[in-house]
Amino acid sequence: MSSDDKSKSNDPKTEPKNCDPKCEQKCESKCQPSCLKKLLQRCSEKCPREKCPAPPKCPPCPSPSPSSCPPKPCAKPCPPKCPSSCPPPCPPPE
């Protein structure tokens, strides 16, 4: 019997009068931040933030191993960083 009495005090569902039913419905359907704040102030246990659908936690994508993804061979030789038409920024001293 004592455990039942304990659950009553711990379970806020037994005291719906602390929460505004209209606000609770809005919180459940639209999850308005203003409504949530009021609910959290009135009874944080009755309408917890968990009512808002949390974004699914996606597992981290495994980085592809270099062996499974070989680099593509260049069809054409890579051009030099500075084409021959471009003079060197600083001529070598003679």
Swiss-Prot record:
Comp. bias intervals (Pro residues): 53-94
Name of this protein: Late cornified envelope-like proline-rich protein 1
Region (Disordered): 1-26, 47-94
Family that this chain belongs to: Belongs to the cornifin (SPRR) family.
Organism annotation: Macaca fascicularis
InterPro entries: Lelp1
